[in-house]
């Protein structure tokens, strides 16, 4: 199976998020309606590092959760593009999420999302 990969410009066509609240640079390993991997480089210039935490910057956990949500939204929007045109995909649930280490500036983060179940238009 080929590795389907989409870039930032294609992601912008799929989800409504924009800078400074777009936390997805690339989507790879896409299996429609099943799974994908999101990639983001958190550069030292991210706006939230100024206050979280001064002198010891760390990516806030809620930003990492948002990255997961955007990865999932991009997966679903990519998978059913015609049905989601001009619609927003919402995060409904997160299971088995653990933050094992802090994420520091200039770190590349990968987030794997799996669509475990769906009911109608809810995944």
Regions found by a protein language model. Give the residues of each.
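Short, conserved beta-turn/loop elements at beta-strand boundaries and strand-helix junctions
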Residues: 31-34, 117-122
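Beta-strand-rich interaction surfaces with strong enrichment in secreted/lumenal proteins
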Residues: 12, 55, 99-101
């Amino acid at each position: 199976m080929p590795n389907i990969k989409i870039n930032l410009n294609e992601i912008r066509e799929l989800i409504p998020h924009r800078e400074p609240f777009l936390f997805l640079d690339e989507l790879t390993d896409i299996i429609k309606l099943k799974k994908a991997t999101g990639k983001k480089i958190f550069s030292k210039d991210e706006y939230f590092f100024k206050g979280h935490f001064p002198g010891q910057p760390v990516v806030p956990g809620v930003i990492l959760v948002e990255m997961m949500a955007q990865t999932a939204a991009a997966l679903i929007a990519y998978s059913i593009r015609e049905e989601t045109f001009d619609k927003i995909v919402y995060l409904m649930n997160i299971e088995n999420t653990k933050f094992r280490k802090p994420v520091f500036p200039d770190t590349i983060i990968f987030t794997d999302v799996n669509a475990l179940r769906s009911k109608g238009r809810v995944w």
